[in-house]
C-alpha cells in the first residue's frame, strides 16, 4: 500500500502522519464496502501503532483525523481513482502499489508520482488450486509457472513485488525496501473484521465522530 500524489508533491506528503494534517485531502474508498480500502486502513493503523507510545487508542485517534480529511468515500478503488485522477479531487490517494504504478503510467507520469511510506502492509491476492479441476484446467501448471523465474519476471513487470530473490534484486530500484506488516499481525482476517469493520467496530466509531 502506497500513496499516489500529484506531480511535484505540492503538499510535501512523505508518510502516514501527513495524511492527518489539516488541509490535506485524502482519497480512499470506504472500508465497509471495499476490500482494498481495508488494506489501506490496516496499513495506516499499523503505522500508528509503531509510533512512540502507540496503542489502540492513539491509532484510533489518528485514523479519526485521517478520515476527517477524506472528502469523498467511494465504494471501491476504481471509484476512488476516478475521483482523484479524473475529477481532480484530493491531494493524495492511498492505493495498492501496482495500481499506483499503472495509474501513473496510463494517466501520465507528468501528472502523478508515487510516495512509499515507512510502514505498509503486505497485501497478497490469493491464488489456489482446486483439486477437482486441477488436472482438467491446468491450474497446477499455472501456479507452478507463477512462481518460476519467468513468471516472477512477468509479475514484476506488471508492478507486483516478486517473491523470487533474484528477480526481486533485479527490480530493487522499482520496489524500495519497506517495513511491512501482515494480516497475521492483526490476528487474521476474521479478527480484523470483527475488531475494525463489523457493525460497531473501530471504523464505525471513527466515522461517527
Residue ranges and their predicted role:
Residues 1-49:
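A conserved helix-loop-strand patch within extracytoplasmic ligand-binding domains
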Residues 2-4, 113, 126-128:
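Residues embedded in well-ordered beta-strands
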Residues 3, 8-11, 31-36, 98-101, ...:
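Solvent-exposed loop/turn segments at secondary-structure junctions
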Residues 7-10, 31-38, 57, 75, ...:
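Soluble non-cytosolic domains of exported or imported proteins
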Residues 8-9, 21-24, 44-50, 68, ...:
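Sec-exported extracytoplasmic/periplasmic mature domains
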Residues 14, 35-39, 43, 58-65, ...:
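Extracytoplasmic/secreted proteins, especially bacterial periplasmic and envelope-associated proteins
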Residues 51-117:
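Ligand-binding pocket segment of bilobal, Venus flytrap-like solute-binding proteins
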Residues 132-209:
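Extracellular/periplasmic juxtamembrane helices and adjacent flexible linkers that interface
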